[in-house]
Curated annotation (Swiss-Prot):
Keywords: Cell membrane, Membrane, Transmembrane, Transmembrane helix. It comes from Rhodopseudomonas palustris (strain HaA2). Belongs to the UPF0391 family. It is found in: Cell membrane. This is UPF0391 membrane protein RPB_2024. The chain crosses the membrane at residues 4-24, 30-50. It is a multi-pass membrane protein. GO terms for cellular component: plasma membrane. The lineage of its organism: Bacteria, Pseudomonadati, Pseudomonadota, Alphaproteobacteria, Hyphomicrobiales. InterPro entries: DUF1328. The keyword Membrane applies.
Length: 57
């Protein structure tokens, strides 16, 4: 799940750079949505990992 969070975060950052650079105005809103989704997914996966107490082997 953490891999998906990182993927969405990278996509959001790229879309944000393109949008704020003036290349695509619509990508600003897309970047905001994807960024917040990535933050929520990161927090959820962090909490689940802490609650389960998983250790990596």
């Amino acid at each position: 799940m953490l891999g998906w969070v990182v993927t969405f975060l990278v996509v959001a950052l790229i879309a944000g750079l393109l949008g704020f650079g003036g290349i695509a105005g619509a990508s600003i809103e897309i970047a905001k949505v994807i960024f917040f989704i990535a933050i929520v997914l990161f927090l959820v996966s962090a909490v689940v990992g802490l609650v389960r107490g998983r250790t990596r082997v």
